[in-house]
């Protein structure tokens, strides 16, 4: 619901997810685990005026309980893709595969090359705020478009706990 509010406020924004890491695995009835990601089409997003895309992934597969949340943010106009893991870990193979899919689609449309930026700074030291870091990252990038905030200084767990109260004040 939090991300839907931002989609309504920012018409150029689309949120996808939260999706498990194995989004492109085909299930027994032929559909992908997460159809929006399997069928993601850069040209369609451009036509619809959706120039900013936020995606939250869980690093567990679809048949598991969920382990750790991470986020991807695509700025189509700037030709940039940003990845945030609050632990500062490298982008997983499956998410990098999606990033490469976006890059290939851009290339097919004769658009300038998209660049992937990864956060290598560890922000999270608690064991429960990864979802909040992912939400905050997408919202911050949507509003401020400044990845340096995540690469240059640590954002503390206590700040995420305050944001949780703000985003989910019920």
Kindly give the residue locations of the regions a language model identified:
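Enzymes acting in ubiquitin/UBL processing and closely related pathways
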Residues: 74-170
